[in-house]
């Protein structure tokens, strides 16, 4: 059993960094470990056992201590030891209510708006599915306003700051990207095809300064019905490589892949088996920051839980291990009711080309008994997206000086001073949909 002696670990790391003559590679590794400990031992797991129990008993009818013990034992709540004491993840309660209907029914003060929003979102998705099937595709013109600023206690007025905010990447789905406004003036706009596209600001920070970009783009998706009988004999060999430390073909994932695949060789059938496994066996779960996880697909396959990106990376890895080209896509899910970060996947099968898989949306549909929506998100996507990233672990243009808040992905932006960067807990970030209109394509 690991008791995570973070205080002792920090002392040892400082000793190696300050007193020992160590290789540069080890120095970099230890500096990253310092950041991981800082996140894990700080904002990510803030609640002690007693505090978690108080949250549960004050929010759920007739909640007992034994229930928290059971949830902890079966890993239904995310927790770790910090210096020998149990600490629960910052969204453990929200995660339980989102993923366990039996506990959601026991909420003492229910928020009718939550149920209303969930119903509205399901209707939006289902209406889009029916439109796509009827018309064969859909195009919208979308306009979004994104902002980022340092929280007051982390604001260092007069110092140089370097700030990145994500914007749409131009490729199959996205065209006609236009920046309408910014504040302050943008220093640099990454190329249209940048794997993680951003606008970059460099300036001296003013009091209460908010960095903003207002942009629009056209977004188009086609509806496809994948037929295994129509698969081409020749398939491409791109997007099949490992990408350490996450897209890696470790023995456990190889065994899982072999178990799911059997003797099947048809890429559509194989990809569907991987999609079915992730959507029916992996429970959706809010996650800690990705850079604190050593291998994301392995975490997903072992713990059978994870959020949208964790599920997408397992699907991508299983596909690549099977000779099916697969890649990452991420950015925002945007509607007039809600805007937030989201990740999904693409896979390539000739003659169809690049098609989509959204395991977390598919899994949600499967748990709700909506078979049509479950099937739809194997091969298809909705219109409510802003894709900013086509790959994981890619540098910005220009690169950040300090360790990124999220070295894997970029959906919220990054903020750094000349001598250190800020964490998400030290920032206020927002994305707002200004408009979304259907257009002819």
Spans of model-derived segments:
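Low-complexity, Gly/Ser/Thr/Pro-rich intrinsically disordered linker/tail segments
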Residues: 379-441
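Inward-facing hydrophobic residues that define packing positions of alpha-helical scaffold repeats
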Residues: 12-16, 20
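Intrinsically disordered, low-complexity N-terminal segments that are enriched in acidic
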Residues: 29-221
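Terminal peptide-recognition signature
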Residues: 163, 274, 345
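Active-site nucleophilic cysteine motif
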Residues: 267-274, 304-319
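Hydrophobic/aromatic-rich core segments of domains that either
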Residues: 2-3, 23, 310-400
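Acidic low-complexity segments
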Residues: 4, 191-195, 200, 205-302
């Amino acid at each position: 059993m690991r008791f995570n002696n973070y205080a002792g670990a920090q002392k040892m790391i400082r000793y190696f960094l300050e007193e020992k003559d160590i290789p540069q590679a080890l120095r970099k590794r230890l500096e990253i470990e310092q950041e991981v400990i800082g996140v894990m031992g700080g904002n990510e797991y803030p609640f002690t056992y007693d505090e978690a129990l108080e949250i549960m008993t004050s929010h759920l009818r007739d909640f007992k201590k034994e229930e928290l013990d059971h949830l902890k034992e079966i890993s239904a709540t995310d927790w770790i030891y910090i210096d020998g004491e149990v600490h629960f993840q910052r969204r453990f309660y929200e995660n339980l209510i989102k993923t366990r209907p039996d506990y959601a029914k026991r909420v003492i003060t229910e928020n009718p708006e939550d149920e209303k929003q969930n119903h509205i979102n399901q209707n939006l998705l289902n209406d889009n599915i029916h439109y796509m099937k009827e018309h064969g595709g859909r195009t919208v013109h979308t306009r979004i306003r994104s902002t980022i600023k340092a929280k007051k206690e982390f604001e260092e007025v007069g110092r140089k700051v370097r700030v990145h905010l994500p914007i749409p990447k131009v490729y199959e789905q996205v065209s006609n990207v236009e920046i309408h406004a910014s504040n302050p003036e943008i220093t640099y706009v990454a190329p249209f095809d940048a794997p993680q596209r951003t606008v970059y600001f460099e300036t001296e920070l003013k009091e209460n300064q908010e960095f903003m970009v207002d942009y629009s783009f056209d977004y188009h998706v086609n509806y496809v019905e994948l037929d295994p009988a129509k698969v081409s004999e020749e398939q491409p060999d791109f997007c099949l490589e490992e990408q350490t430390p996450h897209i890696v073909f470790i023995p456990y994932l190889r065994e899982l892949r072999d178990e799911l695949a059997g003797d099947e060789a048809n890429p559509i059938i194989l990809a569907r088996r991987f999609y079915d496994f992730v959507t029916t066996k992996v429970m959706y779960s809010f996650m800690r920051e990705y850079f604190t996880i050593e291998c994301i697909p392995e975490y997903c396959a072992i713990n059978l839980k994870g959020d949208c990106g964790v599920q997408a990376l397992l699907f991508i890895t299983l596909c690549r291990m099977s000779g099916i080209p697969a890649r990452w896509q991420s950015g925002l899910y945007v509607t007039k009711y809600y805007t937030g970060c989201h990740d999904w996947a693409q896979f390539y099968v000739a003659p169809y080309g690049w098609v989509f898989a959204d395991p977390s949306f598919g899994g949600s549909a499967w748990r709700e008994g909506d078979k049509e929506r479950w099937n739809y998100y194997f091969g298809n996507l909705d219109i409510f997206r802003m894709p900013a990233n086509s790959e994981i672990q890619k540098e910005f243009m220009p690169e950040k000086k300090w360790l990124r808040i999220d070295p894997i992905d970029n959906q919220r932006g990054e903020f750094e001073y000349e001598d250190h960067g800020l964490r998400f807990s030290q920032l206020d970030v927002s994305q707002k949909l200004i408009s979304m209109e259907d257009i002819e394509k």
